[in-house]
Regions:
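N-terminal active-site segment of His-dependent metallophosphoesterases
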Residues: 1-71, 77-86, 91
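Active-site neighborhood of phospho(di)ester-bond hydrolases with catalytic His/Asp-centered motifs
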Residues: 5-7, 42-47, 70-75, 113-116, ...
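Active-site-proximal beta-strand elements of phosphoester/diester hydrolases
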Residues: 2-13, 121-129, 187-191, 251-257
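Active-site-proximal loop/helix segment associated with metal-binding centers of metalloenzymes
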Residues: 124-207
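Active-site environment of divalent metal-dependent phosphoester hydrolases
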Residues: 10-16, 49-54, 76-86, 130-135, ...
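A basic- and aromatic-enriched beta-loop-alpha substructure that forms the phosphate/nucleotide-
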Residues: 68-139, 148
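Short amphipathic alpha-helices and their capping/turn segments at secondary-structure boundaries
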Residues: 31-33, 57-63, 103-121, 172-184
Length: 280
């Protein structure tokens, strides 16, 4: 069975902010032609859209293109929506409220499975969370990383998730990753990346790089040899094999669309076709 792996659609940067479904679908069609490839199934590792309406309509659209669509949430998907261009046509005052709405809407769409802390058909998924343990300099610390996240970073300013208690969020996703990986899915999806994907050199000394990654070795070691871990968040396309401490091999995939002024494939010379993968 062929899977196409993709993430970070940010489709509301490519389509107008609209409540007119026919208008949105015209832009979705062009977006699909430029960024997607045929396959039996599609895995989308988060950041479909900031806007809730665009998010749900994109799910409906993509469901018509593949036999199965698997999705996990991204950091942009779960932002609060309080007073946008459309006034208060639907408010989401907490990220939990928005997450629940997306799960309920996805459950209504045939062929779509939103895997937030869930597993289906041998595919597990969750958004994940950075663990604040990456140190970009010798003077960095978890405390300063968390302070920067809370006061300056997009997530800390636009989420209201567990009251933005970074410690609770880290514990939640550590528990989720352990439970999901222990079920040995053939594909693990997350939006945040295991550090085992590696970080391009130009980001290593950037304090904000900490907010993309977590240490994934304990979870990868739970997976079987030949498993796949798909992630997103960074807008650099990556495809590499990782060998864990137990000698098992895992394929790591990150295929972001990114923003209109970016070229995710440039860093490592990859292309869309590299992310169509045959999975037994």
């Amino acid at each position: 069975m062929k899977y196409f792996f993709i993430s970070d659609l940010h489709v509301d940067f490519y389509a107008p902010l609209s409540r007119n479904v026919s208008t949105l679908r015209k832009y979705f069609e062009l977006f699909f032609e430029r960024n997607f490839l045929p396959a039996d199934a599609c895995c989308i590792a988060g950041d479909i859209a900031n806007d809730y309406f665009t998010y749900v309509e994109l799910l409906k659209f993509i469901a018509e293109k593949y036999n199965c669509v698997y999705v996990c949430l991204g950091n942009h998907d779960i932002i609060m929506e309080l007073d946008g261009r459309f006034g208060v046509d639907r408010e989401f005052k907490t990220s939990e409220e928005k997450n629940a709405y997306f799960i309920a809407e996805a459950d209504k769409i045939q062929n779509v499975m939103l895997l937030e802390n869930r597993i289906a058909d041998g595919i597990a998924g969750c958004m994940g969370m950075c663990d604040f343990k990456y140190m970009h300099s010798p003077t960095a610390s978890e405390i300063t990383n968390k302070m920067l996240w809370a006061t300056r970073w997009f997530d800390g300013r636009h989420w209201n998730y567990m009251k933005n208690d970074s410690g609770r969020l880290c514990k939640l996703y550590d528990s989720v990753f352990r439970k999901l990986s222990q079920k040995r899915p053939k594909i693990m999806m997350s939006h945040f990346l295991p550090l085992e994907f590696e970080m391009p050199d130009r980001y290593r000394n950037d304090p904000c790089s900490n907010f993309f990654y977590f240490h994934g070795a304990p979870y990868l070691e739970n997976l079987d040899d030949g498993s796949i871990w798909q992630a997103g968040h960074t807008h650099t396309a990556m495809k590499r094999e990782f060998t864990d401490a137990k000698g098992k091999h895992h394929l790591l995939l990150c295929n972001p669309v990114g923003y209109p002024d970016e070229n995710p494939y440039a860093e490592y010379g990859l292309k869309r076709e590299d992310f169509v993968v045959e999975v037994e």
